[in-house]
């Protein structure tokens, strides 16, 4: 089968690797344009571009797909199928209708829940116990197409968004392999989504990581887990930004001002919340290394009674 692959970040690499290893003819890879990054503003290739070039696959990096020349390029490649994984651009109707077998997408949630760009983070932030991968046919709506396969996984109680991301990107490749097998054998029974059950997972912003201490300890812990590795949950201690990387919920009937440091132990900081106590175990101040509270307290002080967030 002749396939065009569209993807950009690290999450999209295992699916491309699987297609290459399975012997499909990848006639072209579409990925986002290179972006400058770092102090020298050096142009960085996307992870998908790196993988495609390593296998001598033609790479296309249009700023938009809504362009006649781009449409002609795609048409000339004569794809039987277009596979889209975290590409970062909306496909216009003309492209969706081009391949014989349509366009399919690998999405990192159990649709119709968590449509959008940030499903991996939001399932953890919202305290979900399970998530998974859904493959679907694409239509003009955002993640609204008919579903092909779903595979479910449990979310670990301590699992971070970064760890879940790495698990799901490999699961995505497995589910894509099964999906393409069904397409090749003409065995697909696509299921429409129940749009009334849909939820949305918007892309994350830096401000999302700011901790509201009036929330319960478990809600704050979920925010911490769900924003690792980026943007990372943070608060303020004596005017300095303090990122929090690891925490534990301690059940308590204590009624205190949310955000108040109620105790400082040798390896943790105990903080009052809207419900229960949060034990902070790993922190990072601006310009400093991430470290355990035990190590931080060797040469620094955290004062009991201070209010975090001020």
Curated annotation (Swiss-Prot):
(6S)-5,6,7,8-tetrahydrofolate binds at residues 109-112. The keyword Cell wall biogenesis/degradation does not apply. Disulfide bonds: none annotated. It catalyses: L-methionyl-tRNA(fMet) + (6R)-10-formyltetrahydrofolate = N-formyl-L-methionyl-tRNA(fMet) + (6S)-5,6,7,8-tetrahydrofolate + H(+). One of its GO terms (molecular function) is methionyl-tRNA formyltransferase activity. The keyword Protein biosynthesis applies. InterPro entries: Fmt (IPR005794), Formyl_trans_C (IPR005793), Formyl_transf_N (IPR002376), Formyl_transf_N_sf (IPR036477), Formyl_transferase-like_C_sf (IPR011034), GART_AS (IPR001555), Met-tRNA-FMT_C (IPR044135), Met-tRNA-FMT_N (IPR041711). It is an enzyme of class 2 (transferase). GO terms for cellular component: cytosol. Keywords: Protein biosynthesis, Transferase. SUPFAM superfamilies: FMT C-terminal domain-like, Formyltransferase. Its EC number is 2.1.2.9. Attaches a formyl group to the free amino group of methionyl-tRNA(fMet). The formyl group appears to play a dual role in the initiator identity of N-formylmethionyl-tRNA by promoting its recognition by IF2 and preventing the misappropriation of this tRNA by the elongation apparatus. Belongs to the Fmt family. This is Methionyl-tRNA formyltransferase. It comes from Alkaliphilus oremlandii (strain OhILAs).
